């Protein structure tokens, strides 16, 4: 795909960004994931909401999240501490976040209007640990590819079983880990546990083995009854 950026403005665009991405979206590269993503980003900046929403749906990333934190990350040990939200998904109690007091699962207004979630408000607490969960309804048992992105160290769990632990800290907002997992028929829980830095963001996308996005998966940002698994399963 042709190189897109020149002199970068504060919003991440250059002088010809909009012209280039509009041309690319109509070219043979139009179905490329990166082109769809940047077309969505450009349309959102221009407040072209209909087109932005259309491209958001084409990407098919998880955009229904519920959050819990910020938990203590003393000397960088928090990622290996099993805080209670790791296995307790209901929003009917508060959890002890140690030096950060008591916290609970909560939702963010308008978070489903974006592909990537940035922990902008949570960063006010400084370094710490954040949880994000989503519930995925699948019409059948299926093997899928799960693409995950995070700009900090993280762990991922599917139905309470750890499936990914990042090995390096580097930014790739449209996915830097790809793992093959099995979704069960009915409800599934995906949990991301991330270390907070000044720009922590998360991203998740399910696709088939040919990298086609699913159109029949449903996502929920409130608790849904699911069946926890074990490592043996």
Please name every model-derived segment.
Residues 5-9, 43-45:
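Residue at a conserved register position within TPR or TPR-like alpha-solenoid repeats
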Residues 15-111, 194-233:
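Accessory carbohydrate-binding/adhesion or oligomerization-edge regions at the termini
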Residues 119-130, 167-171:
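Extracellular beta-rich ligand/substrate-recognition surface
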Residues 130, 150-158, 163:
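Acidic, Ser/Thr/Pro-rich low-complexity intrinsically disordered segments
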Residues 132-144, 180-187:
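Extracellular and analogous surface-interaction loops
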Residues 138, 143-156, 190:
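Aromatic-lined ligand-binding clefts that engage carbohydrates, nucleic acids, or primary amines
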Residues 158-206:
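Beta-strand-rich ligand-recognition modules
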């Amino acid at each position: 795909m042709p190189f897109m950026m020149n002199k970068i403005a504060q919003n991440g665009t250059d002088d010809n960004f909009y012209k280039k991405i509009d041309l690319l979206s109509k070219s043979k590269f139009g179905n490329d994931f990166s082109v769809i993503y940047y077309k969505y980003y450009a349309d959102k900046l221009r407040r072209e909401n209909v087109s932005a929403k259309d491209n958001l749906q084409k990407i098919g990333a998880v955009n229904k999240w519920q959050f819990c934190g910020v938990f203590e990350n003393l000397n960088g040990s928090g990622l290996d501490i099993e805080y209670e939200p790791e296995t307790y998904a209901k929003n009917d109690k508060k959890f002890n976040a140690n030096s950060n007091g008591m916290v609970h699962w909560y939702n963010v207004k308008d978070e489903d209007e974006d592909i990537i979630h940035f922990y902008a408000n949570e960063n006010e607490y400084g370094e710490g640990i954040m949880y994000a969960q989503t519930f995925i309804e699948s019409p059948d048992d299926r093997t899928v590819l799960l693409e995950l992105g995070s700009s900090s160290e993280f762990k991922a769990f599917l139905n309470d079983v750890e499936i990914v632990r990042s090995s390096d800290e580097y930014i790739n907002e449209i996915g830097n880990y790809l793992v093959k997992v099995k979704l069960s028929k009915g409800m599934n829980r995906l949990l991301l546990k991330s270390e907070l830095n000044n720009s922590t963001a998360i991203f998740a996308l399910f696709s088939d083995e040919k990298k086609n996005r699913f159109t029949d998966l449903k996502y929920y940002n409130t608790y849904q009854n699911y069946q926890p698994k074990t490592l043996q399963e």
